[in-house]
Amino acid sequence: MLQIPQNYIHTRSTPFWNKQTAPAGIFERHLDKGTRPGVYPRLSVMHGAVKYLGYADEHSAEPDQVILIEAGQFAVFPPEKWHNIEAMTDDTYFNIDFFVAPEVLMEGAQQRKVIHNGK
């Protein structure tokens, strides 16, 4: 199983979602901001099950990685990976946490300083 590097920092968590409350785009193939370089998403399932499908690229017909995450389990996904998820039961309840490399956080802090320096 993929592991989050020990020095990565937990930066945010989504709310807990079910099939009805999760953003629709999460169920479609996507490459989102949460999977940029240096960011590991961790999906945790509280009830039901979620299937993660990872793809080699935007156009691959078949996934190259499939992970079934059941209640009480979590899975870590690689940065920069095209993917989608499927809620496997009507009562599935899950959330996603994001862990970021310290250098990525520093880059973001430097960019904010430049943007907000008043010049």
UniProtKB/Swiss-Prot annotation:
Q: Name one Pfam family in it.
A: DUF1971
Protein's name in the database = Uncharacterized protein YeaR
Q: Which organism is it from?
A: Escherichia coli (strain K12)
What gene does the UniProt entry assign to this protein? yeaR
